[in-house]
């Protein structure tokens, strides 16, 4: 009976005692650590700090429970009957109950923090349930299954050694070792994904204050596939019949293959196997060996050509897929240069009649060749996963200065610390960041956005319609601008302040447009209009979450800002943008002399 297993577990001073002491220590850590209530991500950061130790404790307890049962049922193990497996199944249910209690306790801690921070809302509660389920409940379940499998090793010494090895393998230290070796070994990229998926112990794991911790459905699938893989291994090890051994062995191979299936979901601070997304921009600019093929000719400037209009179809699931129809003002050019993030792979380029056009793609640059003499439009189909910013089923942050759609001309879209700002003599980049310039000229945009996530989406463009179609939320956007910013999450709020459309997150207590914060916005808009030639009337002001690589940008109809760089915004507006239109700086591919080319 399961009741007997529960009583035996509670009477065990080692198992129940260690678990009780551990959770008392966890409580002390959580409730004595200073928490800044305006930081919604702080409770999640604390949870991720203790997660490796939660994993280790449950791993050891599971090993002890199943090892004791194996000793008491050694005769059944030798005979190969089902008594041992049934006894282990009861113990598994007891441990699953302990897993559930720990998950509920941490969930209650998060709810208390949200109430104190005055950000309690249904969307945040549902998100927290998902995070606790993935990073606590499922990870403890993984630890239980691994402990069960290790207990099948006959020697206790070998078992303890395997526990120590397992903890090291699933810890960040092993992940760091693999990451340092993965540049030259493709197989290690896959191992990096395997072991980095489960938990990370460093602070600052949250992407930003709106996206928080990545918790897409793919994480649930992969964790469950790994659990099923471990259970199949256990069944294979203890199956008394050859038929059962064969079936369980095939199931184990199948679940492991499913676990390794590639995915487009965002793994913040993790490597993605077999994609160039595994290397950050900083690493690429400093270390990557660039292609020997140069797509530019000496003397050609970065501007390229003018675009009459964009007609885009964008689909956002765990991966970003898009089709951009670009109408150039001059359809007789032999070549059309575009800037497009290196993480997006161009699948096809055609003209208005559907006939293929040849193209070259190298790093952030795309060159389309026109062999037909005259074309009306260029249709570019591409896909990929966003780096630095994001667009998944959980949230979206794609500012206008981020080349997630093909922009005319070649531009340097990422700046490193110490680089000179083009157009601003003597001014250097402080931190690595994406360029703040919107590279397109004002043109007509028509966007159809199909989003798998059910969160609201906002943009500087006008929303014409919002419908539901085959499990997707479809947004119809249209307008005239020099760039598109798309932002989406479950916490968006919008308010009109003196003719300015302000978009912000309700989780951002310091900037949410209500109460005393309204006067802060009015003062900022007044300063911008008094000290620059930029009129805020009728514009859109998007408050972006603050995180690595985020900065701000200024377009003709909207501003994206964290409200941390007021002085920089005014300076930029007064200098006519960071990259003045008359700047014909040449960008050459296949080289790494970025700083020299910009001086």
Feature names for model-found ranges:
Residues 41, 322, 366, 447, ...:
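Juxtacatalytic substrate-recognition/specificity segment
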Residues 61-101:
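Helix-loop-helix units of permease transmembrane domains in multi-pass membrane transporters
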Residues 121-123, 174-224, 241-318:
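N-terminal, polar/Ser/Thr-rich
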Residues 335, 343-400, 467-470, 513:
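A surface-exposed beta-strand-loop module
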Residues 382-481:
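Extended, low-hydrophobicity, Ser/Thr/Pro/Gly-biased non-transmembrane segments
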């Amino acid at each position: 009976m399961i009741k007997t297993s529960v009583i035996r577990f509670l009477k065990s001073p080692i198992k129940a005692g260690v678990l009780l002491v551990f959770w008392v220590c966890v409580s002390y850590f959580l409730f004595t650590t200073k928490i800044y209530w305006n930081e919604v991500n702080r409770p999640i950061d604390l949870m991720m700090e203790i997660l490796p130790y939660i994993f280790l404790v449950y791993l050891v307890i599971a090993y002890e429970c199943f090892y004791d049962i194996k000793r008491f049922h050694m005769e059944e193990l030798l005979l190969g009957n089902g008594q041992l497996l049934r006894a282990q199944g009861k113990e598994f249910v007891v441990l699953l109950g302990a897993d559930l209690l720990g998950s509920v306790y941490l969930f209650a801690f998060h709810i208390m923090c949200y109430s104190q921070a005055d950000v309690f809302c249904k969307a945040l509660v549902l998100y927290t349930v998902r995070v606790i389920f993935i990073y606590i409940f499922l990870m403890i379940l993984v630890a239980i299954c691994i402990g069960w499998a290790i207990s099948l090793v006959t020697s206790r010494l070998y078992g303890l050694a395997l526990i120590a090895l397992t903890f090291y393998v699933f810890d960040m230290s092993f992940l760091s070792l693999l990451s340092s070796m993965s540049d030259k070994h493709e197989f290690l990229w896959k191992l990096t994904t395997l072991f980095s998926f489960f938990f990370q112990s460093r602070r600052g794991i949250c992407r930003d204050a709106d996206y928080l911790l990545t918790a897409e459905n793919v994480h649930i699938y992969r964790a469950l596939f790994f659990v099923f893989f471990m259970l199949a291994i256990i069944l294979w090890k203890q199956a008394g019949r050859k038929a059962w051994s064969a079936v369980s062995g095939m199931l184990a191979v199948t679940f492991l293959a499913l676990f390794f299936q590639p995915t487009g979901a965002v793994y913040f601070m993790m490597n993605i196997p077999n994609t160039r997304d595994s290397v950050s921009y900083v690493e690429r600019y400093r270390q990557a060996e660039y292609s020997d093929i140069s797509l530019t000719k000496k003397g050609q400037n970065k501007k390229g050509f003018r675009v009459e209009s964009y007609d885009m179809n964008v689909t956002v699931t765990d991966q970003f897929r898009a089709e951009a129809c670009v109408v150039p003002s001059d359809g007789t050019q032999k070549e059309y240069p575009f800037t497009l993030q290196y993480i997006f792979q161009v699948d096809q380029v055609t003209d208005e009649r559907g006939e293929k056009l040849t193209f070259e793609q190298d790093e952030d640059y795309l060159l389309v060749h026109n062999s037909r003499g005259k074309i009306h439009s260029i249709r570019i189909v591409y896909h990929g996963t966003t780096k630095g910013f994001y667009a998944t089923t959980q949230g979206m942050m794609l500012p206008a200065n981020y080349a997630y759609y093909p922009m005319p001309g070649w531009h340097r879209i990422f700046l490193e610390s110490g680089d000179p700002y083009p157009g601003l003599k003597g001014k250097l980049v402080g931190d690595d960041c994406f360029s703040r310039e919107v590279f397109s000229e004002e043109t007509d945009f028509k966007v159809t956005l199909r989003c798998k996530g059910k969160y609201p989406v906002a943009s500087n463009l006008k929303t014409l319609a919002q419908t539901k179609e085959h499990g997707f939320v479809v947004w119809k956007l249209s307008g005239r601008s020099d760039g598109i910013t798309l932002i989406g999450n479950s916490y968006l709020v919008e308010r009109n302040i003196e003719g300015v459309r302000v978009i912000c997150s309700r989780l951002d207590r310091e900037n949410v447009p209500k109460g005393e914060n309204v006067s802060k916005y009015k003062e900022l808009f007044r300063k911008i209009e008094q000290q620059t030639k930029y009129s805020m009337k009728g514009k859109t002001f998007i408050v972006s979450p603050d995180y690595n690589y985020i900065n701000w940008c200024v377009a003709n109809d909207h501003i994206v800002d964290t409200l941390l760089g007021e002085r920089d915004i005014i300076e930029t507006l007064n200098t006519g943008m960071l990259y003045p239109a008359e700047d014909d700086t040449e960008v050459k591919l296949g080289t790494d002399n970025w700083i020299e080319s910009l001086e």
